[in-house]
């Protein structure tokens, strides 16, 4: 049966446009949806969200510093920001839970007593081989210069949540939760000229 002549005609400009849009829509429909930064692997009625949260890094630098310059094994690293986390996880009855606990994902200060301003940030990394974990960085922020890494703490873990606060002496406190005793205090050792973790009082 011969094909009708109308079907053999070369599509005009409008027809080509429609075909092009249709192809783009089909490609978009077939493309996988972008993964959310936070996914929950559990029941919120039974566990706190930061316990069951898994974070999926999607950036390749932190404050302009390539991830693989922070650690050679890293391919991705994304610092935590409130705008990346669903509001319903961070707020309870309209109250910012982190703010109420004096916690933050980034804190500025002069943590080693030097003149340049510094910023501490926490986030999630992913190694090129696949494993993920959480990190804490302290970066120098010289006026008019590029940030420079002063301290790195990174741990492979399936529970990547982390937050920061300051103790009454102005020392940085790293939290692995929002309502628990899981924290570590970072201090500047003047004699050794380096940062280090204070001993856990429960282990002494």
Language-model features: locations:
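Short, surface-exposed beta-strand/strand-loop-strand elements in extracellular ectodomains
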Residues: 133-139
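Bacterial N-terminal signal peptides
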Residues: 16-28
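Acidic, small-residue rich beta-repeat scaffolds with periodic aromatic anchors
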Residues: 30-80, 145-147, 154-204
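N-terminal secretory signal peptides that target proteins for export/translocation
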Residues: 1-14
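Short glycine/acidic-enriched loop and turn motifs that connect beta-strands
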Residues: 126-129, 179
